[in-house]
Regions:
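Catalytic Walker B motif of ABC-type/P-loop ATPase nucleotide-binding domains
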Residues: 159-163
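Conserved ABC ATPase signature
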Residues: 109, 134-138, 142
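The feature captures the beta-strand-to-loop junction immediately N-terminal to the Walker
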Residues: 33-35
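Conserved ABC ATPase "signature" region
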Residues: 97, 112-130
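Helix-to-loop junction immediately C-terminal to a conserved catalytic motif
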Residues: 48
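Conserved catalytic motifs of ABC-family nucleotide-binding domains
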Residues: 155
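Conserved ABC transporter NBD signature motif
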Residues: 56-64, 73
Length: 272
């Protein structure tokens, strides 16, 4: 469904990612992990068409991403950014209905089916009570859930998320990922999400891609790559991986840094 070949990405004179080669099949749930500044968001921007590659190819369903019309691209790809800068006081329902525009007939108006899609998506993201509220007057977490509802109403084949739940509380974060898991399992929705939460990624993603130093350093099934050695290599932090007693998925436990491992002028701290 997605094929990336010899991809190089950057901004101005700065090269961020180089030599990327990977494929994502329909129905995969992929977590993109790595330290701050490693290029996770850059990759999501490129896959969504917001950032043109310096070189290489991004193929979506046998079509070059750059050759797709904005309408066709929006029918295939849904994108949820880390934050949404919505400056106009549109009602939240209207924001969600914007996700239906790629499916409208040319010069056609919104249909009852479009409204049903929007209301269903708001119900799934527990934002139905915000229908008439101006999006500029809801909290940041509520606004982000409205934006996620818009992406679900879009009914894409591929959903790209860039730290999309980082502003949500624990309960809402889990609710969103349960929705994604349900759509992934029942409708074959392909999900790629850039994340910082290691254990959330291990819980929901079937495949993990670790990015560091301008490239992909590890890529594979979660059960194979979520290991102390790989996590330590990527994050330069000592960790243990255990089986969570509740869900039996791998679970990372961070260990304290030893003396001499802290960068900068860290104060001396007496350890208990």
């Amino acid at each position: 469904m997605i094929r990336v070949e010899a991809l190089e990405l950057g901004y101005g004179e700065r090269l961020v990612l180089k030599g990327l080669n990977f494929q994502v099949e329909r129905g995969e749930f992929v977590g993109i992990l790595g330290p701050n500044g490693s290029g996770k968001s850059t990759l999501i921007h490129a896959l969504s068409g917001l950032l043109a590659p310096r070189s290489g190819k991004i193929i979506i369903r046998d079509e070059h991403l750059g050759s797709l019309s904005s309408r066709l691209r929006a029918q295939m790809l849904g994108v949820v950014p880390q934050t949404s800068d919505v400056r106009f006081p549109f009602p939240c329902l209207e924001i969600v209905l914007m996700g239906r525009y790629p499916h409208r007939k040319r010069l056609g108006s919104l249909t009852d089916e479009d409204l049903l899609w929007a209301l269903r998506s708001m119900r799934r993201t527990t934002t139905e009570h915000l229908q008439e509220r101006p999006v500029t007057e809801v909290s940041g977490g509520e606004r982000q859930r409205v934006v996620i509802a818009r992406a679900l109403a879009q009914d894409p084949q591929i959903l790209l998320l860039d730290e999309a739940t980082s502003s949500l509380d624990v309960r809402k974060k889990l609710e969103i990922f349960e929705i994604l898991r349900f759509l992934n399992a029942t409708k074959g929705l392909t999900v790629l999400c850039a994340m910082h939460d290691l254990n959330l990624a291990a819980l929901y993603c079937g495949r993990l891609m670790f990015i560091k130093d301008g490239g992909i350093v590890q890529d594979g099934p979660t059960e194979e790559v979520f290991t102390p050695a790989i996590l330590g290599q990527v994050y330069e932090t000592p960790m243990e991986v255990i089986r969570h007693p509740g869900h039996q998925r791998p679970y990372a436990v961070m260990l304290p840094l030893k003396e001499g491992e802290i960068e900068g002028d860290a104060p001396e701290v007496a350890r208990a």
